[in-house]
Swiss-Prot record:
Chief location category: membrane
CDD domains per record: ATP-synt_Fo_b
Protein name: ATP synthase subunit b
Bilayer topology term: Single-pass membrane protein
Keywords, comma-separated and alphabetical: ATP synthesis, Cell inner membrane, Cell membrane, CF(0), Hydrogen ion transport, Ion transport, Membrane, Transmembrane, Transmembrane helix, Transport
InterPro entries referenced in this protein's UniProt entry, alphabetically: ATP_synth_b/b'su_bac/chlpt
Pfam families in UniProt: ATP-synt_B
């Protein structure tokens, strides 16, 4: 109602201060008719317009809420993904550390095994050298004895023969 009154007051100066010229105008009647028409439209359509805009506001609010829920769900997923990423990085670091310690222990085991093999090979070499040396000594003694026993021009006593063998062996 206040709007109609304000609209009427706003248009009143136009109607009141209009100069009358040679031509008659019906501006006052047209203004009054327009105000009546606007009031009737307002009376008939105000509830429908208000309902339309209220429903539109509610639908926009519902869409906004839906978008905000989707946004929040997306942010939660991003947060979860970041947590999983951090856990994966920690697990990767632990696996790397574990692998490094495993590598060190394997290196140490291999080094120990190689050292033990080298020691065994050296021991076997020394034993084989002793065996070969004793074989060579036996062979030399056998050759010397055979040579001495086969030659008739050398006549030695048992004691001399033992002394010769001991000298050759030593």
């Amino acid at each position: 109602m206040k709007r109609i009154l304000l609209l009427g007051l706003a248009l009143a100066p136009v109607a009141l201060f209009a100069s009358q010229g040679a031509v008659e105008t019906d501006i006052v009647q047209r203004t009054v008719n327009f105000i009546i028409f606007a009031a009737i439209l307002w009376y008939l359509l105000a509830d429908k317009i208000k309902a339309f805009f209220a429903n539109r506001t509610l639908s926009i609010q519902a869409e906004l809420d839906k978008v905000q829920e989707t946004l929040k769900a997306s942010q939660d997923k991003v947060t979860d993904a970041q947590k999983k990423l951090e856990e994966a990085r920690k697990l990767a670091a632990e696996i790397i550390e574990s692998a490094k310690t495993d590598i060190d222990s394997v290196k140490q085991k291999v080094t120990t095994a190689v050292d033990a093999d080298i020691t065994n090979l050296n021991r076997n070499l020394e034993e084989m050298m002793k065996i070969e040396t004793s074989k060579a000594k036996k062979q030399v003694v056998a050759e010397v004895l055979e040579e001495l026993l086969s030659s008739e021009n050398i006549k030695l006593t048992q004691q001399e023969l033992v002394d010769v063998v001991l000298k050759k062996v030593a």
